[in-house]
Amino acid sequence: MSHDSDDKTYPYQKDDAELRRRLTPMQYEVTQHAATERAFTGEYTDTEDAGIYKCVVCSTPLFESGAKFHSGCGWPSYFKPLNGEVIDEKIDRSHGMVRVEVRCNHCGAHLGHVFEDGPRDQTGLRYCINSAALNFESRPENE
């Protein structure tokens, strides 16, 4: 699933040549062409430090460490985004499935998918996000 045919215009307009220079090949394929990194290979799958996870393309803060949980799926999982305005959700009918794709609402970068099998004592949602779509900014617990 590529973003090439999308009709939504995002506030942050990306220059493809600049993105290819700045991002790793995996980051580019994940964020720009909705690729998925292999399970259990992502940099942030097991990260437990306090901080904020930001979009690797535009640096928009997306998730905080307090919403992260171990789902066992092989990708970083969160029960909610930082707020309701940072995420864009689209129906994804690729690979013979119907899922909800999650994108950065500022630049349109593909992040992953959201499923309804998250912690029931929280939102019940599991935002399953590719590490390649994120940068982590460590912060002290009390900030």
UniProtKB/Swiss-Prot annotation:
NCBIfam families: peptide-methionine (R)-S-oxide reductase MsrB (TIGR00357). Its EC number is 1.8.4.12. Its cofactor is Zn(2+). Zn(2+) binds at residues 55, 58, 104, 107. GO terms for biological process: protein repair; response to oxidative stress. HAMAP family: MsrB. Pfam families: SelR. Residues 16-139 form the MsrB domain. PROSITE patterns: MSRB (PS51790). Keywords: Metal-binding, Oxidoreductase, Zinc. The active site is at 128 (nucleophile). GO terms for cellular component: cytoplasm. This is Peptide methionine sulfoxide reductase MsrB. Binds 1 zinc ion per subunit. The zinc ion is important for the structural integrity of the protein. Belongs to the MsrB Met sulfoxide reductase family. It catalyses: L-methionyl-[protein] + [thioredoxin]-disulfide + H2O = L-methionyl-(R)-S-oxide-[protein] + [thioredoxin]-dithiol. One of its GO terms (molecular function) is peptide-methionine (R)-S-oxide reductase activity.
